Each structure stands twice: as structure tokens, then as C-alpha cells.
């Protein structure tokens, strides 16, 4: 029986279902079992039964002949080794391909990262430039506000000097009225009443009533003009008039008028005038000392 080339391309051991080292007895036994199962007479409806039966017969012919089997095993081994080499080569090619694809992906990712970094850098540079421009505008605005504040403070100092050219610091007046120690109404002059009487002449900075000396108070005006108007015009309550005299900040012309008025029966006594002159010569810092002293007297209370 001639063996076809197509049969040699097949795995005869696998066709019979036996091991490569199977003995002739095992080969024949396997052939009988396979041949019976696929005999054309038993499988009339299977068109491949005759072909398979023919292949089994050829396999038996090759594997039961020692020389033919040895030649077949040699060819089979060579084909197997070639297949293994091809598989290894395919695996190597596959690995090379995978490595190449991985490097390409890595290169693309790196390029993408570089592009993203470049975009981020450009964005950062733009933001820095924007902040620099906005910072310059803000700096200019702050410097403008500082210059404006300095100008306003300078103007205020100039106005304050103009208002107090003749006096020392802010003007302060001494207020006196009749009041008995046991008089709870304080002679009709509470702090609110005095403020209502005096604030119509100008801003009142401080007003301190002495509890140790009933009927006595000190008022501090913001301007000399307001103090002058109060001295010249305020008389207080009709049934209990106020006596108003200068303590600090009295203009020179007002001092002259007060001095000449004393010789003509002014309401100021000689003692009040001397006290007025001494107080006018004090520095502006004594204002706080005077107020603090009177507040301390109020806290201590009247002597027993």
C-alpha cells in the first residue's frame, strides 16, 4: 500500500490514539478499534468514513514497518522541532512587537506629557504676567491712596494750626454754676443738658463734671471759634446762669478783652483770671492730665 504525502503531514500516533513509543501489538490493537468504529460498512451515511478507514490502514502500514516508522519518526521529530522554533520565533516576534508597541505608547505618552507641560508652562507664564499687571495697578492704587491720605492729614494739620494759632492745643473752658452738695438735680445741669447748650456752638470733644466740686465742669471744644462763641453767648439756665471762663487755648485778643473787662466789673473774679492765665501757658499735653485728674477725683468721691 502506497503511503501518500498528505498522510505524512499527519500525526499518525494521534490518528491511532497511541503513544510515540507504543509497540507493534499496541499499534495493531489501536488500529482494529479505530477501524471497526469507522468502517464504511458500519457508517454508510458518513462520506468521510472510507477516507478515515484508508488513513488508518496507511498508518498501520507505516508504524508496523521498522524502517518506515524510523523514517517517519525522524521527519516527525524534525517537523516538531521546526514547529517549536517557529513558535519561539513567533513568541520572540510577538515580544518584539509588544515591546515596540509599548515604546511607541511610551513615546506618545511622553510627547503628550511634554505638550501638557508646555501648555501648563504657557498658562503659568500668562497668569504671572496677568498678576504682574494687576499687581502694578493695585500698587499704583495703594500708592495713590497713601498720597491722598498724606495730603488729607497735611490739610487737617494746616487747618488745625489755623484754628489754634493763638492758643495752645484744643480750647478748654471752665463752667461754674450754683449747686449745693445735697442737690440731686445738680442745679439743673446734667451732662446731657450741658452738651445740649454747648454743642450748638461747635463740636465738643470732652465734657467732665466734677462730683467733688458740685457746680463745676470742664468742656473741651474742637475749635477756638466754637469756644469763643460759647464764652460770648452762652448764659445757661435763666434761674441758674452759667459762668464760663477760659482754661486753655484762649486767643490773645480774647485775653486782652478779658483783662480790660475785669476793671469794668467783669463776671470773672481776680482769682479766676489768674487761674486762666496760668492754664493758658500750659502745653497741650496737660489736657489729658487735667481730665485724668478730674476723673480720679470723681472716682474718689467727695471728702467726708
Swiss-Prot record:
InterPro entries: DnaJ_domain, DNAJC17_RRM, J_dom_sf, Nucleotide-bd_a/b_plait_sf, Pre-mRNA-splicing_ERAD, RBD_domain_sf, RRM_dom. It is found in: Cytoplasm; Nucleus. Signal peptide: none annotated. The keyword Cell membrane does not apply. The modification Phosphoserine is found at residue 112. Residues 79-106, 118-145 have a biased composition (Basic and acidic residues). It comes from the Eukaryota. Keywords: Chaperone, Cytoplasm, Methylation, Nucleus, Phosphoprotein, RNA-binding, Transcription, Transcription regulation. Residues 79-145 are annotated as: Disordered. The modification N6-methyllysine is found at residue 264. May negatively affect PAX8-induced thyroglobulin/TG transcription. This is DnaJ homolog subfamily C member 17.
Amino acid at each position: 500500500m502506497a503511503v501518500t504525502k498528505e498522510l505524512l503531514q499527519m500525526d499518525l500516533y494521534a490518528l491511532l490514539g497511541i503513544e510515540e513509543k507504543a509497540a507493534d501489538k499496541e499499534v495493531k490493537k489501536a488500529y482494529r478499534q479505530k477501524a471497526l468504529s469507522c468502517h464504511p460498512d458500519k457508517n454508510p451515511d458518513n462520506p468521510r468514513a472510507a477516507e478515515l478507514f484508508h488513513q488508518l490502514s496507511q498508518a498501520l502500514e507505516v508504524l508496523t514497518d521498522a524502517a518506515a516508522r524510523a523514517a517517519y519518526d525522524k521527519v516527525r521529530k524534525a517537523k516538531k522541532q521546526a514547529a517549536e522554533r517557529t513558535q519561539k520565533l513567533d513568541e520572540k516576534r510577538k515580544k518584539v512587537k509588544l515591546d515596540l508597541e509599548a515604546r511607541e505608547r511610551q513615546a506618545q505618552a511622553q510627547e503628550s506629557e511634554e505638550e501638557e507641560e508646555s501648555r501648563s508652562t504657557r498658562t503659568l507664564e500668562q497668569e504671572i504676567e496677568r498678576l504682574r499687571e494687576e499687581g502694578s495697578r493695585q500698587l499704583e492704587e495703594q500708592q495713590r491712596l497713601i498720597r491722598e491720605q498724606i495730603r488729607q492729614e497735611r490739610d487737617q494739620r494746616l487747618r488745625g494750626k489755623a484754628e489754634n494759632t493763638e492758643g495752645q492745643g484744643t480750647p478748654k473752658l471752665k463752667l461754674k454754676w450754683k449747686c449745693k452738695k445735697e442737690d440731686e438735680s445738680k442745679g439743673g445741669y446734667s451732662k446731657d443738658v450741658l452738651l445740649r447748650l454747648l454743642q450748638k456752638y461747635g463740636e465738643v470733644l470732652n465734657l467732665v463734671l466734677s462730683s467733688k466740686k458740685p457746680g463745676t465742669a470742664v468742656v473741651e471744644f474742637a475749635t477756638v471759634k466754637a469756644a469763643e462763641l460759647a464764652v460770648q453767648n452762652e448764659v445757661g439756665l435763666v434761674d441758674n446762669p452759667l459762668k464760663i471762663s477760659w482754661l486753655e487755648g484762649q486767643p490773645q485778643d480774647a485775653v486782652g478783652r478779658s483783662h480790660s473787662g475785669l476793671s469794668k466789673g467783669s463776671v470773672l473774679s481776680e482769682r479766676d483770671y489768674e487761674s486762666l492765665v496760668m492754664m493758658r501757658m500750659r502745653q497741650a499735653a496737660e489736657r489729658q492730665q487735667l481730665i485724668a485728674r478730674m476723673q480720679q477725683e470723681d472716682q474718689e468721691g467727695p471728702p467726708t
